[in-house]
């Protein structure tokens, strides 16, 4: 199974990187690398994430990397990463089409 990052998830990664890079560009690169690597781990264990509490019964799951929630859905063609956001923020339901 492969990991497919949606356009929205990629936009969120860029926003995170741009924000962190304002104070520490090297840390921003490391953070994005960790998030992407964590998402890549879903290829071996797609069900390792928990069900997103804000969206019960939808099949939307999440894994955590540091302070960030990586939200995804398991599809026949692969794991679809829907969005990434800082855990203290309100859940972006528009990002997942719910």
Residue ranges and their predicted role:
Residues 2-60, 94:
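Basic, Lys/Arg-enriched alpha-helical interface segments
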Residues 65-68, 73-98:
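Enriched for short, Lys/Arg-rich terminal
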């Amino acid at each position: 199974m492969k990991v497919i990052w949606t356009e929205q998830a990629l936009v969120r990664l860029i926003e995170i990187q741009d924000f962190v890079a304002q104070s520490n560009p090297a840390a921003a690169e490391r953070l994005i690398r960790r998030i992407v690597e964590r998402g890549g781990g879903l290829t071996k264990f797609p069900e390792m994430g928990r069900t997103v509490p804000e969206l019960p019964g939808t099949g939307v799951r999440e894994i955590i990397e540091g302070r960030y929630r990586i939200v995804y859905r398991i599809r026949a063609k692969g794991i679809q990463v829907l969005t990434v956001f800082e855990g203290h923020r309100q859940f972006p339901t528009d990002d997942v089409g719910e």
